[in-house]
Amino acid sequence: MAERSNSEEVKLLGMWASPFSRRIEIALTLKGVSYEFLEQDITNKSSLLLQLNPVHKMIPVLVHNGKPISESLVILEYIDETWRDNPILPQDPYERTMARFWSKFVDEQIYVTAMKVVGKTGKERDAVVEATRDLLMFLEKELVGKDFLGGKSLGFVDIVATLVAFWLMRTEEIVGVKVVPVEKFPEIHRWVKNLLGNDVIKKCIPPEDEHLKYIRARMEKLNIKSA
């Protein structure tokens, strides 16, 4: 069973609209781990968050039996190593390494580049969109012949890449630019449908209407025009 003892205490400091927080919820839910969610205000950081993550001062933070772990990719690996049921990383050493590679690629390349679309206009925005599409094409090719980036079932890279499936593709609706058009990325759109068919994913992603309202509000606060 996922829960190894009745005395285990698992808490997650997160924020409901954060893709980095939500990926931890997905992993814990997939593993069947009970946890307490502590919603954080990222604009007014709590003393608890600053105490548990004094280095980065950011969410998410997983607290397992009083011990804090920060950074979402690190937390995901910890969860997989601690609760062995429903593994999200492959057993094969090469495949595990490649899962780590693609996860870092999503966070450090796709996410960082795609978020620059927000606030850009004209030729600057067009250049960012093209750069993002060039990066997304690597995922498009990886998905050929697969139901998920992890193969036949939901895995580590899929959980990480939900920020593409839901956050990026919802943000493009707000900014009025199709970064991931279906005619250019049919495999990614097929993969998104597969994600939406997964009960854990459906349970753990933010409700679309509330999420869109949040994105719009954030953009207004930053004086960024939406479509």
From Swiss-Prot:
Enzyme superclass (EC): transferase
Domain GST N-terminal residues, every copy: 8-87
Gene Ontology CC: one annotated term: cytosol
EC code: 2.5.1.18
GO molecular function terms listed in the Swiss-Prot or TrEMBL record: glutathione transferase activity
Reactions listed under catalytic activity: RX + glutathione = an S-substituted glutathione + a halide anion + H(+)
Function of the molecule: May be involved in the conjugation of reduced glutathione to a wide number of exogenous and endogenous hydrophobic electrophiles and have a detoxification role against certain herbicides.
Protein name (database record): Glutathione S-transferase U7
Taxonomic source organism: Arabidopsis thaliana (Mouse-ear cress)
Gene: GSTU7
